[in-house]
From Swiss-Prot:
Tissue: Expressed in submandibular gland and lacrimal gland. Not detected in other tissues.
Protein name: Mucin-like protein 2
Organism in which the protein naturally occurs: Mus musculus (Mouse)
Biased composition, class Polar residues, residue ranges: 18-52, 88-104
Keyword presence, Thylakoid: no
Length: 138
């Protein structure tokens, strides 16, 4: 039982580390593309979105081991983030939204991906803490 818990802990740690790398790389790459004035920012974003989707699919196995309380907490945090994002969008300047519609869509997609990533990190971290507590008790 302890071996299984350690194995799951190792897998969760690996996923957590892999979640952090695409975020760092996509931010640096899209910043470079924006400063150069090239249209490669959308390609970079698409690549990072694909990476996040791959992490989502591989993470679903690990999330089965996490209690539904943690999942509910992550969902509530996601809903709060979405509400904050809607509030931020509603207070923005409407003329700037009309002038750069494509850029706003890309930014919104990127922020949604980051929100999902942060929620996954929260769920994984709480699962890791529970596993640590379990191993210390056992």
């Amino acid at each position: 039982m302890k071996f299984l818990a350690l194995l799951v802990l190792l897998g969760v740690s690996t996923i957590l580390v892999s979640c952090q790398d695409p975020e760092t790389n996509s931010t640096e790459t899209s910043g470079t593309a924006d400063s150069a004035g090239e249209n490669t920012g959308s390609e970079t974003q698409a690549d990072s979105t694909d990476q996040n989707q791959e992490v989502d699919s591989s993470d679903s196995v690990e999330e089965e081991n996490v209690n539904t309380d943690d999942t509910n907490t992550a969902n509530e945090a996601s809903e709060e983030d979405n509400k904050e994002e809607l509030n931020d969008n509603s207070t923005g300047d409407n003329t700037s939204d009309q002038n750069s519609g494509v850029d706003n869509t890309e930014t919104e997609d990127e922020s949604n991906a980051k929100t999902k990533l942060e929620n996954m990190k929260t769920v994984i971290k709480s699962g890791v803490e529970k596993l640590k507590n379990f191993l210390q008790r056992g």
